[in-house]
């Protein structure tokens, strides 16, 4: 049995997940982070992307986060995000429409805020594609 630790994923609106996991993977601003039980304490910013965590039965779950912070303590890991959406709740058509709108607007102007929005939509789309490829394989 692999060592486990408590993982909390919290958005500005609600708690998305709270439970025991074997590992968690997030996109930090300095690169990808893999966290396992006993990891060194850490506080870092995370960028828009995927949080992937593995449960004891080796089931993987995916959550899109818009960025935020990761805090690693001896027995608990917390992901704080402005926006967090479970992978299976992402809507591909809405994501693609928002991505196209951001690309179109960005092509007409050079705006850092729009560039950030485009990066968030691309990150959402990646999470959606990963979740759906996993669901397709299970069928």
Swiss-Prot record:
InterPro entries: ATP_F1_dsu/esu_C_sf (IPR036794), ATP_synth_F1_dsu/esu (IPR001469), ATP_synth_F1_dsu/esu_N (IPR020546), ATPsynth_dsu/esu_N (IPR036771). It is found in: Cell inner membrane. Gene3D superfamilies: F0F1 ATP synthase delta/epsilon subunit, N-terminal (2.60.15.10). This is ATP synthase epsilon chain. It comes from the Bacteria. NCBIfam families: ATP_synt_epsi, PRK00571.1-4. Belongs to the ATPase epsilon chain family. F-type ATPases have 2 components, CF(1) - the catalytic core - and CF(0) - the membrane proton channel. CF(1) has five subunits: alpha(3), beta(3), gamma(1), delta(1), epsilon(1). CF(0) has three main subunits: a, b and c. GO terms for cellular component: plasma membrane; proton-transporting ATP synthase complex. One of its GO terms (molecular function) is proton-transporting ATP synthase activity, rotational mechanism. It is a peripheral membrane protein. Pfam families: ATP-synt_DE_N (PF02823). Keywords: ATP synthesis, Cell inner membrane, Cell membrane, CF(1), Hydrogen ion transport, Ion transport, Membrane, Transport. Its main location: membrane. Produces ATP from ADP in the presence of a proton gradient across the membrane.
């Amino acid at each position: 049995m692999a060592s486990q630790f408590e993982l909390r994923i919290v958005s500005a609106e609600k708690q998305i997940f709270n439970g025991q996991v074997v590992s968690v993977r997030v996109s930090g601003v300095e690169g990808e982070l893999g966290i396992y039980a006993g990891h060194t304490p850490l506080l870092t910013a995370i960028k828009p992307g995927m949080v992937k965590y593995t449960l004891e039965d080796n089931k993987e779950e995916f959550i899109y986060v818009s960025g935020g912070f990761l805090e690693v303590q001896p027995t608990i890991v917390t992901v704080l995000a402005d926006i967090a959406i479970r992978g299976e709740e992402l809507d591909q058509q809405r994501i693609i429409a928002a991505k196209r709108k951001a690309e179109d607007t960005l092509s007409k102007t050079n705006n850092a805020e729009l560039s950030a929005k485009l990066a968030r939509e691309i990150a959402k789309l990646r999470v959606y594609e990963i979740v759906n490829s996993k669901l397709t394989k299970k069928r």
